[in-house]
A protein has these predicted regions:
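Contiguous, well-ordered alpha-helical segments that form the cores/surfaces of helical PPI scaffolds
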Residues: 87, 283-286
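"A position-specific structural signal for the A-helix of alpha-solenoid helical repeats
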Residues: 152, 229, 287, 352-355
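Long, polar/charge-rich, low-hydrophobicity segments
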Residues: 179-185, 193, 197-202, 212, ...
């Protein structure tokens, strides 16, 4: 079950107790069968055929097949606001310019904004709706969902020139900062409780009532995601406080990693005894690479290299490719004996290793990313539309990275316009970095590089796309002098 009200949970526990008392052998047989099935499924994630860019189109067909053309969104009831699928559609619209993807985005984001899945009073998105038309919400608010949706609403606002999506993104970030962020812990709580009575109140009544309490714990993987989202949105929204918060969270996560106390769960009392899982390390690596891209600090890159080595040593399958979800536990009980490869967290790692390869020029990192994605060639279709991030990761790996570094002041409108222009570029593997301009330098500039070839800086957003198009075309004819094509400013 996705969610059980207290009375249903109590009833289910009573049924379990009765079955254990009266039919224990059957329960043991079922448990053994389940464990054997999981072991068999885990063996399927091994190196498959060669990775092909055509897989991006296959994922596109899967995602489009799940699209709800009546209500927007993907899948049937219960309807989840799946940020990873929206991210993939944003990516496909940016890289193809096809109106069909734009229509899917608008139908989906408008449906969510106008429906009951968005809390228009306090801000933030609920976990899901019981009905396909975005009604009858289940009132829990999840950190990961809201982070991903804030990022994708903001990206869609830029791609589609729809300022209302930007406002929704900002309101969602404001909700997270006011309701889930704990400055004493330097982390976001995992969720806000599903208090249907409170969320059914009018805004006036809510203002006089206590909001539902948040989860008392912070989780390393979702806070790694928070770092990447806040760093990205800080520059797009022109809000320096978001970058400050992101780096404080990253410092907390990485300090635990360096002290060998990195835990999946932490609170103001410190890290718990629950060890970090692979997903936590994957998101830490992604956060370090995002911080390196947004600050140009080499210390984050150095730490990323160290974290990548830990991930390979503890979790990587040297024979079949891909990363296991937990460390090897020969003495583990039950399902803890089974090391599985989870597609979602492996795609996070693959994308981070692609960025690490670009920053270090160490070919080993690219090979690890490729081996990770190849491990799911035979099984990604089983995930349905949830394979969206896999399609995105394949698209990144199979294309050369175009790196756009925007140099400016975070709060400057001209800098934000350049970043928006960069975010509209159609190149599949696009890495937008930022550098704070020197004091007194009031002109924002974009520096564009493809592999080892870089252009003179561009300060006009309208010229950025033309410059990048010229550079990618120039790479097809490497004997021409690029400084004759792009004489600079």
């Amino acid at each position: 079950a996705t969610y059980l009200p207290p009375e249903q949970l109590i009833s289910m526990v009573a049924e379990f107790a009765e079955a254990y008392k009266n039919d224990r052998p059957t329960l043991y047989t079922q448990a053994r069968d389940l464990q054997n099935n999981r072991k068999e499924h885990a063996r399927q994630s091994v190196a498959g055929d060669e990775l092909e860019e055509s897989m991006v189109d296959r994922v596109s067909r899967i995602v489009v097949g799940s699209y709800d053309a009546v209500n927007g969104g993907f899948g049937s009831e219960p309807k989840f606001p799946n940020a990873s699928v929206i991210r993939f559609i944003n990516h496909r619209y940016r890289t193809t310019g096809e109106d069909f993807f734009a229509a899917m985005l608008i139908k989906t984001l408008d449906g969510m904004s106008d429906g009951q899945v968005l809390d228009n009073s306090d801000g933030g998105f609920f976990r899901h709706c019981a009905q396909a038309d975005w009604t009858q919400p289940q009132h829990e608010k999840m950190l990961e969902d809201n982070l991903g949706l804030a990022r994708e609403f903001l990206n869609a606002a830029i791609l589609l020139d729809r300022p209302q999506y930007r406002e929704t993104a900002k309101q969602t970030i404001d909700y997270l900062m006011s309701q889930l962020y704990d400055p004493d812990t330097s982390g976001f709580r995992g969720s806000q409780g599903a208090h249907s009575e409170y969320f059914s109140m009018s805004p006036d009544r809510r203002s006089k009532a206590a909001p539902p309490a948040p989860d008392p714990s912070c989780y390393a993987n979702s806070n790694g995601l928070a770092v990447t989202v806040l760093l990205d949105t800080a520059w797009k929204l022109g809000d320096a406080s978001l970058q400050t918060t992101a780096l404080q969270i990253l410092d907390r996560l990485d300090s635990m990693a360096q002290a060998d106390t990195f835990s999946h769960v932490y609170s103001e009392d410190g890290p718990s005894d629950v060890p970090a899982f692979f997903t936590d390390w994957a998101w830490l690596l992604a956060a370090l690479m995002q911080a390196h891209g947004n600050t140009a600090s080499e210390s984050y890159l150095e730490r990323a290299v160290a974290v990548a080595q830990i991930m390979v040593d503890r979790f990587f399958d040297q024979k079949g490719g891909g990363f296991f979800d937990i460390e090897d536990q020969p003495e583990g009980i039950g399902h803890l004996q089974i090391r599985e490869k989870v597609l979602a967290e492996n795609t996070v790692a693959a994308q981070a290793f692609v960025r690490l390869h670009q920053s270090t020029r160490n070919e080993d990192y690219r090979q690890i990313a490729e081996a990770t994605l190849i491990a799911f060639v035979e099984t990604f279709r089983e995930q349905g539309e949830f394979a969206a991030d896999y399609g995105l990761a394949v698209h990144l790996l199979k294309n050369d990275m175009v790196e756009v570094t925007v140099e400016g002041r975070l709060e400057d409108a001209g800098c934000q316009e350049l970043i928006a222009a960069a975010a509209r570029l159609p190149q599949p593997n696009l890495d937008i970095k930022t550098v704070m301009a020197a004091e007194g330098d009031t002109v924002a500039r974009a520096h564009v590089c493809l592999d080892t070839v870089c252009l003179p800086p561009v300060d006009d957003p309208a010229e950025l796309a033309e410059a990048v198009a010229g550079l990618t075309k120039q790479q097809e004819s490497p004997f021409q002098d690029i400084f004759q094509v792009f004489p600079g400013n």
